[in-house]
UniProtKB/Swiss-Prot annotation:
The gene is miaA. The lineage of its organism: Bacteria, Bacillati, Cyanobacteriota, Cyanophyceae, Synechococcales. The keyword ATP-binding applies. It comes from the Bacteria. It comes from Prochlorococcus marinus (strain MIT 9515). It catalyses: adenosine(37) in tRNA + dimethylallyl diphosphate = N(6)-dimethylallyladenosine(37) in tRNA + diphosphate. One of its GO terms (molecular function) is ATP binding. GO terms for biological process: tRNA modification. This is tRNA dimethylallyltransferase.
């Protein structure tokens, strides 16, 4: 007897682990589409700095949840979940198998486990006080108030840092302890990549990022949205902005971006290990192993 619940395939892994390339190979083999679960790739014009699938890759396989919003519009995990769930249900209604790919742990789990966001409206006074303190001090505060949350976000991400503090100061509860509830009525096959050569891959990707246009991309974003756009404080863009300001050389920017990305990848791996139940793929033959596991789940 076939399972009554529809199957949703999930591929997770830290940044630069090769998710995009593997996902495209899997999607081609099974003739399915990709739903990108990435907190920055959802924004238009942010291509090189987010390692967004190329136009060639997007033409080869249909991608959803890419270039959905303008960089000036903040999309939080709850909003992302709502957008993604609509996209997934649309495919399920067409009798297709959705394929979710990404490294944003909180966003992915908000989709596959159900998300209950803290009912805390924006606190203007609190936010202004945190902004005056500066990101470095706010990050140190968050490490004390909600250490688990700091494992899931980039330490330069002012928006999520302040939101974490805001929730804690208003409710007295950690944002990381927010409950996942009402999981969707799907069967989830969760696959994971855990590369042993991740540091080398991160360095190579960062070097390519600066060689192939992140500085020009950052200039264009600044010209359109201003240099204070919060997304320009995230990894890669912040360093590119400092090259433009002549505060860093390109070599220094590459080194700093690489270091930050490695630190972020470590936090991603910790999150996946503690919060997810992935079947980790065999590094010697990722595609073959993934195909075997997906075919078994499909029955």
């Amino acid at each position: 007897m076939l399972p009554s619940k529809p199957l949703v395939i999930v591929l997770i892994g830290p940044t630069a682990s090769g998710k995009t390339e593997l996902a495209i190979d899997i999607a081609k083999y099974f003739n399915i589409h990709i739903h990108n679960v990435d907190s920055r790739q959802i924004y238009r014009f942010m291509d090189i700095g987010t390692a967004k699938p190329t136009k060639v890759q997007q033409r080869a396989i249909k991608h959803f949840l890419i270039d959905v919003e303008d960089p000036s519009v903040k999309v939080n995990a709850k909003q992302f979940q709502e957008i993604a769930t609509k996209s997934i249900n649309r495919e399920l209604n067409q009798k297709k198998t959705p394929f979710l790919v990404g490294g944003s742990g909180l966003y992915m789990n908000s989709i596959i486990k159900g998300f209950f966001a803290p009912d805390v409206p924006p606190q203007s006074f609190l936010r202004s006080q945190f902004e005056k303190l500066g990101q470095e001090k706010c990050w140190e505060l968050l490490k004390v108030c909600d250490p688990e949350l700091t494992k899931t976000i980039n330490y330069a991400d002012q928006i999520r840092t302040i939101r974490g503090l805001e929730v804690f100061y208003v409710t007295g509860k950690r944002m990381s302890s927010q409950r996942f509830q009402n999981p969707p009525p799907w069967r989830i096959l969760e696959l994971g990549i855990n590369r042993v050569d991740l540091k080398e891959r991160i360095f190579k990707r960062t070097k390519n990022m600066f060689e192939f246009g992140i500085i020009e991309e950052t200039k264009n974003i600044i010209n359109q949205y201003g240099s204070t756009l919060p997304l320009l404080e995230t990894i890669g863009y912040k360093e590119a902005k400092n090259v433009i300001k002549e505060n860093l050389t390109i070599e220094e920017a590459i080194e700093l971006t690489t270091t930050k990305t490695i630190q972020f990848a470590k936090r991603q791996k910790t999150w996946f290990r503690n919060k997810n139940n992935a079947i980790w793929l065999n590094n010697k033959n990722l595609l073959k192993d993934a195909i075997i596991k997906i075919e078994y789940a499909l029955g």
